[in-house]
């Protein structure tokens, strides 16, 4: 739940969720549509600037969270960079196995770098939203949409109990580890099976307790919550419009220039 904690502590937390959602999604669409190195770098740097310097989120936490998608981005880019052919004509370097060559060409390397930078830009947009807007605010926003309430309520409960069950599984694993439950492969399999079965039983017990608690508080089929006060920041809205216009202009210029 570190992302939610950082979102609650962000200086941008009280800005209207709809403003931040539209802003981040607009920039995300532009970043993907532009397919431009310049736009992607501009988006990534400015989004990180907003998160760290305006939102006052610790850069250590931000970069730690960024390592999660970075691994998948690099793996995907590596797959794009590797070319397979019958000769090593335009490859910068290659390895051959029989009559097949595996290597990296100038074109494939450029494509890989472009995709990687574009992914960084897109991920930074999503992190801007997630690190400045708690899930509670997003669920509140969804309640005002055309999505049926029961779907939103199920999503809220699932989101909440993912972390509850994760905490329970961590405690069980710690207790097992303290009793040498993972000392060798055979014992590890046995301990993992016990952890899974105990977690399943506790999940059912927790669900029953939760439903009983909700009924005792007058649950009638709908979860009623107090809507938080929404701050429609004129400054942020003006900034968002200007930013989107500038990003669009850069995208159009870069597409024409082929950057």
Give the label of every model feature segment.
Residues 1-37, 46-50, 165-259:
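Transmembrane alpha-helix interface motif
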Residues 20, 58-71, 240:
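Alpha-helical transmembrane segments and their helix-start/interface "positive-inside/aromatic belt" motifs
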Residues 36-44, 61-64:
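Short, aromatic-rich membrane-interface segments at the entry and exit
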Residues 37-38, 58-59, 147-150:
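Membrane-helix interface segments
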Residues 43-50, 137-141:
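Hydrophobic transmembrane alpha-helix segments characteristic of membrane transport
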Residues 47-56, 71-75:
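Alpha-helical transmembrane segments and their membrane-interface exit regions
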Residues 51-57, 132-133, 252-253:
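Structural signal for the C-terminal ends of transmembrane alpha-helices
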Residues 66-179:
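Juxtamembrane/interface alpha-helical elements of multi-pass membrane proteins
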């Amino acid at each position: 739940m570190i992302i939610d904690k950082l979102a609650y502590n962000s200086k941008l937390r009280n800005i209207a969720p709809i403003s931040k959602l539209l802003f981040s999604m607009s920039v995300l669409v532009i970043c993907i549509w532009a397919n431009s190195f310049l736009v992607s770098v501009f988006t990534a740097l400015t989004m990180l600037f907003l998160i760290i310097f305006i939102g006052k989120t610790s850069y250590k936490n931000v970069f730690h969270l960024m390592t999660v998608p970075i691994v998948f981005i690099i793996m995907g880019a590596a797959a794009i960079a590797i070319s397979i052919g019958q000769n090593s004509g335009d490859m910068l370097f290659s390895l051959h196995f029989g009559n097949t060559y595996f290597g990296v060409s100038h074109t494939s390397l450029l494509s890989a770098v472009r995709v990687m930078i574009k992914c960084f830009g897109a991920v930074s947009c999503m992190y801007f939203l997630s690190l400045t807007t708690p899930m509670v605010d997003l669920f509140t926003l969804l309640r005002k949409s055309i999505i049926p309430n029961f779907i939103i309520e199920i999503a809220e409960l699932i989101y909440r109990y993912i972390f509850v069950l994760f905490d329970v599984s961590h405690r069980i694993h710690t207790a097992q580890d303290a009793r040498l439950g993972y000392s060798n492969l055979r014992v590890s399999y046995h301990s993992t099976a016990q952890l899974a079965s105990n977690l399943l039983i506790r999940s059912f017990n927790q669900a029953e307790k939760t439903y009983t608690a909700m009924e005792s508080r007058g649950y009638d089929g709908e979860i009623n919550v107090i809507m938080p006060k929404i701050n429609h920041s004129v400054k942020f809205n003006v900034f968002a419009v200007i930013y989107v216009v500038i990003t669009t202009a850069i995208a159009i210029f870069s597409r024409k220039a082929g950057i």
